[in-house]
Amino acid sequence: MASQQGQQTRKIPEQEKKDLDQRAAKGETVVPGGTRGKSLEAQERLAEGRSKGGQTRKDQLGTEGYKEMGKKGGQTTGDKSAGEREEEEEED
């Protein structure tokens, strides 16, 4: 993935790179997944790291576990035990 993004960057004309870098410095996201990067290069690195992190979790959990993790992402854990939540899910 890193080499792919690096190759994409090299194909961009120098003037366009400068423009993207300036926009990134102003806080604009110019690379998908590069949120909060303060330069074009920083945004590329952030996007690559986020992609690798997600892939690693998917590999560790398997496809089904990864999907299940996404479904439960918004649920709070402080109010009920896992068993109580599971019982409620079975009722629905």
From Swiss-Prot:
InterPro entries, A to Z: LEA_5, Sm_Hydphi_plant_seed_CS, Small_hydrophilic_seed_prot
Source superkingdom: Eukaryota
Bias (Polar residues): 1-10
Keyword annotations from UniProtKB, A to Z: Stress response
Basic and acidic residues compositional bias, start-end: 11-26, 38-71
Induction data: By abscisic acid (ABA), osmotic stress and heat shock.
Tissue specificity comment: Maximally expressed in dry seeds. Also present in mid-maturation embryos.
Residue numbers spanned by region Disordered: 1-92
Stated family: Belongs to the small hydrophilic plant seed protein family.
Entry function: LEA proteins are late embryonic proteins abundant in higher plant seed embryos. They may play an essential role in seed survival and in controlling water exchanges during seed desiccation and imbibition.
Name of the protein described by the UniProt record: 10 kDa late embryogenesis abundant protein
